[in-house]
A protein has these predicted regions:
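Transmembrane and membrane-interface helices of multi-pass
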Residues: 2-190
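Conserved small/polar residues in nucleotide/adenosyl-binding loops
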Residues: 196-197
Length: 197
């Protein structure tokens, strides 16, 4: 019984990419989506569609990056990096209302150990442990089934990237003005997306 529970689950590359991409783009962007809801009223069908297109764009961007990384066997390290950074940034955004940007990362590097320990709370360790470390371990633990044909694998990944690019272009064609206005008037939103970090 225990042996069966500890057996590594296996997925094909496509399923693994979709699962990792979904977690990073949707689950680790909750802080971003909450901030968008504060400035984008869902009082019309158009605004609802604009809001619903945001996870699609985030999903497509992360999917492109992870799929490109899979050509060099970097999909797992990239996914782990995105998961850990996204979980940490989301925790700080939701807990302290701060946005992690490039200057904040510079400040983190300059932080003394005493300052770092002052920020560590049981809530932080639990949140980062579950949404970051555990999720990264699971992403690495899942066994990716080898593909039967190299050509088929390359074609699949190319199609995966193409579909993601087409989704981004479709959203841009339909909602470019809305995105431009929203992000121009609310610059802090750009920095709170996990794919910006």
């Amino acid at each position: 019984m225990l042996k069966r529970l500890l057996k590594r689950p296996s997925l094909n590359l496509f399923s693994w990419l979709l699962l990792a991409t979904f977690y990073i783009s949707v689950c680790l962007n909750i802080a971003f989506f909450k901030q968008v809801l504060q400035v984008l009223p869902l009082d019309s069908l158009h605004n609802v569609l604009v809001f619903l297109s945001m996870p699609v764009v985030a999903f497509s961007v992360i999917n492109i990056v992870l799929t490109l990384g899979s050509f060099l066997w970097l999909n797992r390290p990239l996914a782990c990096l995105f998961i850990l950074v996204g979980a940490a940034a989301q925790y700080f955004i939701m807990t302290y209302g701060i946005v992690i940007d490039r200057s904040m990362i510079t400040n983190i590097i300059d932080t003394t150990p005493a300052e770092s320990y002052a920020l560590m709370t049981p809530r932080m360790l639990l949140t980062l442990g579950l949404s970051g470390v555990l999720a990264a371990i699971i992403a690495c633990w899942i066994k990716i089934k080898p593909t039967t044909s190299r050509l088929r694998s390359v074609l699949f990944r190319g199609a995966n990237i193409l579909i993601s690019v087409l989704l981004i272009l479709l959203v841009a064609a339909l909602f470019y003005k809305d995105y431009a206005s929203l992000f121009r008037n609310n610059k802090e939103l750009v920095k709170s997306r996990s794919e910006e970090r």
